[in-house]
Amino acid sequence: MRRLLEPCWWILFLKITSSVLHYVVCFPALTEGYVGTLQESRQDSSVQIRRRKASGDPYWAYSGAYGPEHWVTSSVSCGGSHQSPIDILDHHARVGDEYQELQLDGFDNESSNKTWMKNTGKTVAILLKDDYFVSGAGLPGRFKAEKVEFHWGHSNGSAGSEHSVNGRRFPVEMQIFFYNPDDFDSFQTAISENRIIGAMAIFFQVSPRDNSALDPIIHGLKGVVHHEKETFLDPFILRDLLPASLGSYYRYTGSLTTPPCSEIVEWIVFRRPVPISYHQLEAFYSIFTTEQQDHVKSVEYLRNNFRPQQALNDRVVSKSAVRDAWNHDLADFLDNPLGTEASKVCSSPPIHMKVQPLNQTALQVSWSQPETIYHPPIMNYMISYSWTKNEDEKEKTFTKDSDKDLKATISHVSPDSLYLFRVQAVCRNDMRSDFSQTMLFQANTTRIFQGTRIVKTGVPTASPASSADMAPISSGSSTWTSSGIPFSFVSMATGMGPSSSGSQATVASVVTSTLLAGLGFGGGGISSFPSTVWPTRLPTASAASKQAGRTVLATTEALASPGPDVHSAPSKDSEGTEEGEKEEKSESEDGEREHEEEEKDSEKKEKSEATHTAAESDRTAPAPTPSSPHRTAAEGGHQTIPGRRQDHSAPATDQPGHVAPDLDPLVDTATQVPPTATEEHYSGSDPRRPEMPSKKPMSRGDRFSEDSKFITVNPAEKNTSGMLSRPSPGRMEWIIPLIVVSALTFVCLVLLIAVLVYWRGCNKIKSKGFPRRSREVPSSGERGEKGSRKCFQTAHFYVEDSSSPRVVPNESVPIIPIPDDMEAIPVKQFGKHIGELYSNSQHGFSEDFEEVQRCTADMNITAEHSNHPDNKHKNRYINILAYDHSRVKLRPLPGKDSKHSDYINANYVDGYNKAKAYIATQGPLKSTFEDFWRMIWEQNTGIIIMITNLVEKGRRKCDQYWPTENTEEYGNIIVTLKSTKVHACYTVRRLSVRNTKVKKGQKGNPKGRQNERTVIQYHYTQWPDMGVPEYALPVLTFVRRSSAARMPDMGPVLVHCSAGVGRTGTYIVIDSMLQQIKDKSTVNVLGFLKHIRTQRNYLVQTEEQYIFIHDALLEAILGKETAVSSSQLHSYVNSILIPGVGGKTRLEKQFKLITQCNAKYVECFSAQKECNKEKNRNSSVVPAERARVGLAPLPGMKGTDYINASYIMGYYRSNEFIITQHPLPHTTKDFWRMIWDHNAQIIVMLPDNQSLAEDEFVYWPSREESMNCEAFTVTLISKDRLCLSNEEQIIIHDFILEATQDDYVLEVRHFQCPKWPNPDAPISSTFELINVIKEEALTRDGPTIVHDEYGAVSAGMLCALTTLSQQLENENAVDVFQVAKMINLMRPGVFTDIEQYQFVYKAMLSLISTKENGNGPMTGDKNGAVLTAEESDPAESMESLV
């Protein structure tokens, strides 16, 4: 600290200060980016588009410089006269006799498993692989459907359809495109040859209930969240996605609604919508796209992906001639053309606002009528304008009849005043439209004002590149609401006025001085107020009183909200506001908590701005005069006006001139706005009017060119002080304060840096080069003793050990404390906590995950090494980078290319109570195999966790970095595969790793003596990319076993998937939380995840994965660890039979968990369809949708893909068994089709009821006659018998299934078993049949089909005991609970009685006893209990199980 007092520091300080002042004085108009004229920007934009066109890959978007108004530059057809979409006016549509019933062929069939969905970046498309044909409806022939596309709005059911009817737009529009297969072989060929194609438009309308027909689509959307993602869809029926009645439709000739906009489309627009719930709508709003501006790519939400509506021109819209179809509820449809929201507004906003000077003292305002009129006719227009002069604000509103020219002349214009104009349409009953664009005019300079930004049309916004894993986050600025606020200068400046629908107006809290400076009023900055954070309700009394005690000042940062909040098309201006207001209505009503969270976010943002450069420190804070004392408004930063009563506020505590100490003192609130207002208009003499600061210092952006017609601030840039204005005569008045402020700011920065350097130096000395360990939040009993001790206090940034090369960082990394309210949750309360998160459509999970997404937004963590040109090829994905501060550094290789040989895309990640517990990395590339194995050797890694398959959905996710057999050499590392063990959901490989450069006993060898080590790879094989596993239990088993394999002398556990973020982060969180549960009986998922997000980007990639973590942990808490070694099983069984405090045994509690499964696992809607009900013997034993065995559907027949059968997980494969019912006479062929489709070669028949009729009991053909199943025939070729030890017999049939079209043959063996399990036989005989089946299965492929009469307990028991016996053989342990629960999850209704569950335990005890005692003497009873001769203690005997 003494160095700060040395003269050289002060000399340096004075030089820097003088340089800053010289820069500010000499270049006051410089901004972050070049701001040119409108003509220049349009020219640049056109050049960029022409370049893309020349390259053969024209880029287009739904907004910005490549938005719809620019499509014509790259696709000339987009400027044609017959473009789509259009607004269809029902009363103008004529009935066409040629438009009769629509004929659909194949639409009633379920789609095949080849149908797939893709996120194209512009929409979500379904590629249809089945035959769907459309004819009729005036189409010139029989057309084949090839693809389906969707268009949607911003959020919460806002308008998103491309077409509209009578001005009514819907949340989603689905479009089905088809072509003539007689002329072309594909849809794309028809477009390229400019031939006629067809399209259907189907509207989706919000309904209170889920539409089950959409479930496969919604499930598919979750698999294509990110750009270019693809997924196969579950079977669906395309007809179910259409309206119930197809008779009412409109017809017109139009174009494609996307480039190339070819005018070749025969449109069929259905009048009736299809229902969709808000919950299902959310899947559309979660889709991401990649936006591109020049060479910069950014990941944004894909929203508002619709083209603006086009003019009808000379075209005619026709209606179908199916008259009865138009009668039903048409009146209701027309009376309310836009539903609940549109019924409140007169029309869309007036468009094409212009302000032009007529002479020195007069202006002319002109506009065009709204594109859509919801409640015609328009009676008149209201022109409102406001102006300022000599710090006094004037305002005037007048009306103009709609039948006259849409122009207004404003006389007596002063060149020294600022004028703001906007127009509103008025219909009958004083129903009004939304306001038009707000135009700002001063001294021949016109600006378009949208929302809270001044924008220049046609200029692309260059967004910073981000990852597909991170959604853009809106940071809410302080806001307040007012009921009926007048249309004052403030409401104009924020682009918001009184709501035209009579609802509460939403007004941005402040218009800061940057806006006013650019217009000649003062210096400062303008805040961005994303629509997603504007409340539409007044705060509650309690919330307002909490918020009233502090002053919140305006910030200078404009943040881009997710989705296009600045529309390029004028017709969308009001829609953005309307959609934002709709979104607010779905927000949580817990007002206090929302305001507190916004308040904290605002504080963090404002504190961070205190350290900005001098370019942003040219703002002053004028203190209010003593004659104007004020109170603060809730979170708004507004000062109340003397004499005006403030509702819902606490008594004032702040003194005049007081500034909150924790906020930026350099920010100026230029306008003072009352938190409440009356319906009366303000007058110039009203003492309650907002006051302007008496002095108007200019910012750097206080000059503008007289030649500029439009001046813009790029909303994607952070500095919004780039608006240009005239110089002010009071320029020198703020230079002295600026010097003082700059000096103080610089001193504070130097002191802060010195403190940080000192603090980090102390930590290095204390920790001897290792980071401090994370501390945990104490349990509830410890909190009183530990005080305010919190979990994961800071993010750890690492000091590498001596074996790693050191790189001097370019900048210091900030230390991020975890929020104070992040406390661990006791496990007893975790179930209740999850219930709260699931409530309100999983709103709690969404809030938590948004907080996770924001936690690193302001940290400025660098990843320069990943972006270095020499390292970019080492990254599997361009947007998944390794943070510099926590990256794993390899020892540099000798040679000329050694400079960047220390890089690998991997980061250290902390675990529970252990720093650097994991290494999170990407799936290795072939070019990085050597680096990967070097890292494993140097880090002494003994466990590899792999959570991806090499290829998924046809895409390479990871390259195989281990030898398939024998040995492979990767640089200096030789890897040998020692063994492979395959389990149902994961595979364990034991690898030997040897370093040829390390000799035994060499000093550089971390282990000191060995040059060979063993590395175990745990490879989970059932985890879908960007998704989650179907069931949590197998994942828990995988995590527990891989975690238990780690030895104390091993280095970090290496975890990777494909990108090394989503599935990798999920594993790390589950593993760490399981350790915390074991150690402290507490859980802190949110706090821990926010902590590790500072160490590798985007760990836990999706909200779905975040929810899965909670589900898995809850499963672990409820079920506990149930795997038991064979030697402990007897004592374990006795312990779970002891009644607890409530009188219930743990066995009863386990069985309750088995039978009470989560509702999402037991959905059985396919089995409950009317066409399938007759195929079920017992409606209570049907397949769950997640594990249902599907059949290849037969063409033209509905429901032919259904059979009452379920996959069951075994020990070696996830679909090792299929449990089904005894075939019914009319489902016998379905049974054999299932065998054929799934290549099953073993059938085990367990008859529960011997009273079945002969024709029903025997479902196979006789030897004399084959059974014909169309695609194949079934022939019995032999029959044999196998005697068991109890003299019972198994009848064995051998069948051959031969294809009728080719030479394929499938051999099937059928075991017709006696009564099993036999209650009259010893329990040990139970495994005799199982051993026969197991031995046969070793030589056969495909699943084993097991059936009893209903496909219930007997079949389930055989699968359970087979799996458990295999587990006992391989692991010398069993997990009865997990096996039984998995069977009940995959086929609900198998285990329904606790005695069935007890029998599984008895059988396993018998098997273990048999193995331990050899074939010693056994005594059996008829109830199935077994006693060995040596057993004498009744408490320890299996008799106690009865």
Curated annotation (Swiss-Prot):
Q: Where does the record place the site Ancestral active site?
A: D1348
The UniProt GO MF terms for this protein read: identical protein binding; protein tyrosine phosphatase activity
Glyco sites are at N109, N113, N156, N359, N444, N719
Domain named Tyrosine-protein phosphatase: residues: 845-1116, 1147-1407
Q: Name one GO cellular component term.
A: membrane
Regions of this protein lying in the Extracellular compartment: 20-733
Query: Which residues of this protein are catalytic?
Result: C1057 (phosphocysteine intermediate)
The UniProt annotation puts the region (Disordered) at 461-480, 557-726, 769-788, 1412-1442
* Membrane topology note: Single-pass type I membrane protein
Q: Which residues form the Fibronectin type-III domain?
A: 349-448
The record's EC number reads 3.1.3.48
Q: Which domain of life is it from?
A: Eukaryota
Positions bearing Phosphoserine: S1179
**Where does the record locate the signal sequence feature?**
1-19
User: Where does it primarily localize?
Assistant: membrane
Q: What enzyme category does the UniProt record give?
A: hydrolase
Checking CDD domains in the record gives: alpha_CARP_receptor_like, FN3, R-PTP-G-2, R-PTPc-G-1
Q: Which residues does the annotation say bind substrate?
A: D1025, C1057, S1058, A1059, G1060, V1061, G1062, R1063, Q1101
Under catalytic activity, the entry for this protein gives: O-phospho-L-tyrosyl-[protein] + H2O = L-tyrosyl-[protein] + phosphate
- Tell me the SMART domains matching this sequence: Carb_anhydrase (SM01057), FN3 (SM00060), PTPc (SM00194), PTPc_motif (SM00404)
Q: Provide this UniProt record's keywords sorted from A to Z.
A: Disulfide bond, Glycoprotein, Hydrolase, Membrane, Phosphoprotein, Protein phosphatase, Repeat, Signal, Transmembrane, Transmembrane helix
What role is this protein assigned? Answer: Possesses tyrosine phosphatase activity.
Could you give the subunit structure recorded for this chain?
Monomer; active form. Homodimer; inactive form. Interacts with CNTN3, CNTN4, CNTN5 and CNTN6.
The molecule here is called Receptor-type tyrosine-protein phosphatase gamma
